[in-house]
Amino acid sequence: TTVRCKMPNGTEATCNVTVKPLATSLKLNASEIVLYIGQSFDINSSVPKGTAAYYRLYSSSNSKIAAVTRGGGVVKGVATGKTTVTCTLNNGKKAICDVYVVPKAKKISNVPLIGQSKLPTGCETCSATMLLNFYGYKISETTFADKYLVKKPFGYSNGSYTGPDPNCAFVGTPYSSNSYGAYAPIMVKCMNKYLSDKSYKAVEISGKSLEYLSGKYVAQGQPIMVWATINMSPSFKTTTWRVNYTDENAKYKLGSYYTWTAGEHCLLLTGYDKDYYYFNDPWTNARTRYSKSLVNTR
């Protein structure tokens, strides 16, 4: 409908009014965020199409850790810690976002360093072993490779190369420089095979930025395995093979074709600051750093 206001002198103004059903739900653009002290983030909220809300109020469970503008949803990190921001509609519907406020720099200094000299293509195994050693588990990279790493051969059959989905098994053997590697799902599975009677469990976290992972985990003293490239150099596609082995983590079907990305490399992320990420690198057998801008391209 249209509302009109007319002054005695004839001046007129109009306002178009649309009446919609009251929103029955509410969604924020993030369920959790990581902020540095002093950093801000706008938590936008939305309601289902065709509905409306008269107002939306934002609140923080601990404004000494992260403050939020009451009517706007802009969150600002104040001090390290965790808090929860809640958005409430006029009908009582709510949505929440967990907020982690972290220091601008963190380095975990006591992470054991293991080079891959015994396992030429075993960067994933060495990184997993470093992580296990950090949590106090006494296991060598060769023992992990021999007893816990799922390995499937790479070969040639019926006119094409054959091998496993690298999400489901190591392609070849880490003892050979002519082998390939493995991705996060199978490494998590292998680590949890070792940890089956232990208090810790390995968890795969995909689709998150290194900035998020640094704030959520490294800032809390937890190093993490990440996949990038050797020396952070550009990668390129190489060998293609027909997939002949999968498991519950498969991203490729049996009989389909997979093309390996050359230069794939697994490292242990141990720190960050304004400009750099810090790693335990099994390839160089060194604690090294790479610029954030470079790492984010790999």
Q: Where in this protein do the model-derived segments appear?
A:
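Active-site-adjacent structural segments surrounding the nucleophilic cysteine of cysteine proteases
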Residues: 102-189, 230-232, 238-252, 257-261
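Mid-length scaffold segments of soluble, non-membrane domains
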Residues: 175-178, 182-186, 190-203, 211, ...
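Short, conserved catalytic or adaptor-binding loops enriched in Gly and charged residues
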Residues: 48-49, 192-196, 298
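Surface-exposed patches in mature extracellular/periplasmic domains of secreted proteins
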Residues: 137-145, 199-208
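Active-site-adjacent substructure of cysteine-protease-like catalytic cores
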Residues: 207-280
